[in-house]
Amino acid sequence: KTKLGTQDYDLYKRVVDPVREQTDLILSLTTSGIAGRNLPHEVRLIPLAFKPELASFDAGSINLGGDVFSNPPDFLDVAAAKMIQSGVKPEIEVFDLGMAVTALNMNKRGQLESPMYFQFVMGTPWGAPGTPKALLHLLEHIPEESAWSVIGIGQSHLPMSLMALIMGGHIRVGME
């Protein structure tokens, strides 16, 4: 109705239940909320009630268009604990090196479990460029046993996807 993203439980249920009944797809649901709206933690974490295999874990705040996509440390702490409690694997979304470092520090403190799964978001105007050099730089900083995938934004989609496949990573497709 509003054409905005939502964390509405009933709307998620209308989508998740038929997908679960009719397929064996791996579900990755978002805890990202909506940039600029600063939803309460409990609202952002509603999708974890559906026990998806993966859920987004944006490892820091970032400018997003004309708004700030806010992921302060207190939210990251709550989200990480809830994901462990729910048995949901965090899809650690990394828009820049600082987010990877945040996730690594949380792993050292036991807040994120190993092996970690990193999703490198490349080519946004406010984050890491969608270049082979930028991807290699990010990969140098994560543990070798980590799984990782790439999403290239705009023009970087195809080159980043091909690079990930060549290097043994994964690519992200689908809707958000």
What is each stretch, according to the model?
Residues 29-38, 96-99:
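Short, glycine/charge-rich beta-strand/loop segments that flank catalytic centers
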Residues 1-2, 30, 103, 164:
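Histidine-centered divalent-metal-coordination microenvironment in nucleic-acid enzymes
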Residues 6-23, 43-54, 105-118, 172:
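Short, electropositive alpha-helical surface patch
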Residues 1, 27-31, 92-93, 173:
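Short beta-strand segments at enzyme active-site cores
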Residues 3-6, 38-39, 102:
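Short Asp/Glu-rich motifs
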Residues 54-175:
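Catalytic alpha/beta core domains of metabolic enzymes, predominantly
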Residues 38-48, 157-161:
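Short, acidic/polar
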Residues 3-31, 78-85, 137-145:
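Alpha-helix-loop-beta-strand connector modules within alpha/beta enzyme cores
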